[in-house]
Amino acid sequence: MLDSKLVRTQLTEIAERLATRGFALDVARFEALESQRKSVQVRTEQLQAERNSRSKSIGQAKARGEDIAPLLAEVDQMGSDLEAGKRELDAIQNELDNLLLNIPNLPHESVPVGADEDGNVEVARWGTPRSFDFEIKDHVALGEQHGWLDFETAAKLSGARFALLRGPIARLHRALAQFMINLHTGEHGYEEAYTPYLVQAPALQGTGQLPKFEEDLFKIRREDQADLYLIPTAEVSLTNIVAGEILDAKQLPLKFVAHTPCFRSEAGASGRDTRGMIRQHQFDKVEMVQIVEPSKSFEALEGMTAHAERVLQLLELPYRKLALCTGDMGFSAVKTYDLEVWVPSQDKYREISSCSNCGDFQARRMQARYRNPETGKPELVHTLNGSGLAVGRTLVAVLENYQQADGSIRVPEVLKPYMGGIEVIG
């Protein structure tokens, strides 16, 4: 959430910056609500002061032996008016808060301006796509050839956009997740966490999925308790570890990593990537989250992105790194890098990781703070999140890039210890 004071004092500039994201801030609505808020607040404060004065007069009149009944009635009426004013003020403030909750973050000045993914800027490439001397197969054909990948049974169980993995491919999927977790904890300094897969609404509001993107979530309604949501990413549960906390500066940075399933309705993806494992309702992801001091968040973003890149490099998968433009960034991000891995059957790069600096946007929603050692006062932390990596899409990339003419798959060198030394599957 943006700082309400910043929005009030720099409304025009904020609206212009948000316009580069394709977001039209309702300036007139904000100004009208802000005007109402000020008017009601002034009226309420004046009424409170007047009531306090009248209350003092009651004691003085009583001491003089005067009839205080009229004064008591007047003070009672003022009390009723004051309560009504406070309710009106709360209603206006709730509208303002709801307006602010639906406003995306401001892009950093270093973010390229663009309307959509066509405006993204390629920063770097690593590796060279392999040249095949045989007709390549996509991951679906490779998986189904050996009976490892079963979409028909998955559809019988759960409907479209689910996959059933069996045998060596299921083991390879597990190997990838274990390799990623071990790399991030062993070499990159992250603390592994096992988190709930079901969270309440405030957690999703804290990281920015609610209220704006509820249609993308799977919701579990409960009659006698708060509704629960399946996490769309471990970013939600990991980042909310610090919700409502005031951290000691010595605790920072906090670096968490978790391997979890992720659940997304893909409400806006009708007709896209309907074949295979690229876009699923349920998929596994290894997620990195960092909680840092404000001055260190952009440095942390570069480091986190490098951690995700290291996974691809060790797997020897060609990829490219993109700086997302203003119109393609996620709701909560100040700046984002995407990593796209080479998918031979599609003859193009596909997203496999997104690493974002969210600044104090999520922290303000969560009230996550640290005590600044220089001032002794609580200040908002900065939060970052990144995929390290999406396990299913990494599996797709390994299957297709490591395929052989007979449909068998070479096991990447770094995965052999997790595969019992097996060099080829199929």
Swiss-Prot record:
Q: Where in the cell is it found?
A: Cytoplasm
**Residues that coordinate or bind L-serine:** 233-235, 287, 387
* Database matches in Pfam families: Seryl_tRNA_N, tRNA-synt_2b
Keyword Signal assigned to the entry: answer is no
Q: Does the keyword Aminoacyl-tRNA synthetase apply?
A: yes
A single Gene Ontology MF term assigned here is: ATP binding
* Annotated TM spans: none
**Which top EC class is named for this enzyme in its record?**
ligase
What does the entry list under GO cellular component? Answer: cytoplasm
The record's annotation in InterPro entries points to:
aa-tRNA-synt_IIb, aa-tRNA-synth_II, aa-tRNA-synth_II/BPL/LPL, Ser-tRNA-ligase_type_1, Ser-tRNA-synth_1_N, SerRS_1_N_sf, SerRS_core, tRNA-bd_arm
Some GO term, biological process aspect, for this entry: which one? selenocysteine biosynthetic process
Could you tell me which cysteines form disulfide bridges?
Answer: none
The catalytic activity, as recorded, is:
tRNA(Ser) + L-serine + ATP = L-seryl-tRNA(Ser) + AMP + diphosphate + H(+); tRNA(Sec) + L-serine + ATP = L-seryl-tRNA(Sec) + AMP + diphosphate + H(+)
The annotated pathway is: Aminoacyl-tRNA biosynthesis; selenocysteinyl-tRNA(Sec) biosynthesis; L-seryl-tRNA(Sec) from L-serine and tRNA(Sec): step 1/1
> According to the UniProt entry, what is the EC number of this protein?
6.1.1.11
Q: Which domain of life is it from?
A: Bacteria
Residues that bind ATP = 264-266, 351-354
CDD domains documented for this protein? SerRS_core (cd00770)
Q: Write out the entry's keywords from A to Z.
A: Aminoacyl-tRNA synthetase, ATP-binding, Cytoplasm, Ligase, Nucleotide-binding, Protein biosynthesis
Tell me the SUPFAM superfamilies matching this sequence.
Answer: Class II aaRS and biotin synthetases, tRNA-binding arm
The entry's family comment says:
Belongs to the class-II aminoacyl-tRNA synthetase family. Type-1 seryl-tRNA synthetase subfamily.
Oligomeric state and interaction partners are given as: Homodimer. The tRNA molecule binds across the dimer.
Comment, domains: Consists of two distinct domains, a catalytic core and a N-terminal extension that is involved in tRNA binding.
Q: What's the name of the protein? A: Serine--tRNA ligase
Organism (species): Ectopseudomonas mendocina (strain ymp)
